[in-house]
Swiss-Prot record:
Ranges for domain Galectin: 13-144, 152-279
Protein's name in the database: 32 kDa beta-galactoside-binding lectin
Organism from which the protein derives: Caenorhabditis elegans
Binding site for a beta-D-galactoside: 213-219
InterPro entries: ConA-like_dom_sf, Galectin-like, Galectin_CRD
Gene Ontology MF annotations: carbohydrate binding; galactoside binding
């Protein structure tokens, strides 16, 4: 069982962004390389998804032949000054590259770890197209998210129906002690409490009914790391919640209440949130 069905995207890949790239949003690119890989690039363009002379606010070039990742911009017909850093991606391995936009910079994250900040040289609002080229297999491209307050609380208009999944993208704070994700019932009870505790090195799972906690479940290691990003997926199945962390199945939590009665979401603790989805 997998939290995410693998897809295959054509390379070269071209896409038009339907809305403006705004601060808080993240571009997620996942794929894999081959042993013969030399280079691949991710580009954020203005006006067209090619190099016909229009500006390129961000050029990310992953170079195995040089052992570097190179960041640059193309403006007014000229490339700017390159910013280089050692390439942590290995030939033949899968990779996860995220580009999060902020008011003054792009935050580049490689395999869930902060890689480098790149200050804007062109307006973020000028970005309209995306291109991905080179020696890679591409299996996931997603753009979205925003700045989320923590604590975060929201009703779920359509609930979390059986067969659907909650996706939470975030980064654990470097001095984190705990965070939690709660799925709420209509009456305010907590159908599922998911609580990574770094001070105890466990992840607590529980439920709350009529103001009383049930029996804790805490088997298994804590798969989250301080200062490192994560993808958390909670699948609502008929008999249990299935939990995946960074694409790997983690635990199952048998339902203690009606699985069709999920009406709200709470997220709190020592994390930065970058995305929340239901799919």
């Amino acid at each position: 069982m997998s939290a995410e069905e693998p897809k295959s995207y054509p390379v070269p890949y071209r896409s038009v962004l339907q809305e403006k790239f705004e601060p808080g949003q993240t571009l997620i690119v996942k794929g894999s390389t081959i042993d013969e890989s030399q280079r691949f690039t991710i580009n954020l363009h203005s006006k067209t998804a090619d190099f016909s002379g229009n500006d390129v606010p961000l050029h990310v070039s992953v170079r195995f032949d040089e052992g570097k990742i190179v960041l640059n911009s193309f403006s007014n017909g000229e490339w700017g000054k390159e910013e280089r850093k050692s390439n942590p991606i290995k030939k033949g391995d899968s990779f996860d590259i995220r580009i999060r936009a902020h008011d003054d910079r792009f935050q580049i994250i490689v395999d869930h770890k902060e890689f480098k900040d790149y200050e804007h040289r062109l307006p973020l609002s000028s970005i309209s197209h995306l291109s991905i080229d080179g020696d890679l297999y591409l299996n996931h491209v997603h753009w979205g998210g925003k700045y989320y307050p923590v604590p975060y609380e929201s009703g779920l208009a359509n609930g979390l129906p059986v067969g659907k999944s909650l996706l939470v993208f975030g980064t654990v704070e470097k001095k984190a002690k705990r965070f939690h994700v709660n799925l709420l019932r209509k009456n305010g009870d907590i159908s599922f409490h998911f609580n990574p505790r770094f001070d105890e090195k466990h992840v607590i799972r529980n439920s709350l009914a009529a103001n009383e906690w049930g029996n804790e479940e805490r088997e298994g290691k804590n798969p989250f790391e301080k200062g490192v990003g994560f993808d958390l997926v909670i699948q609502n199945e008929e008999y249990a919640f299935q939990v995946f962390v960074n694409g790997e199945r983690y635990i199952s939590f048998a339902h203690r209440a009606d699985p069709h009665d999920i009406a709200g979401l709470q997220i709190s603790g020592d994390i930065e949130l970058s995305g929340i989805q239901i799919q």
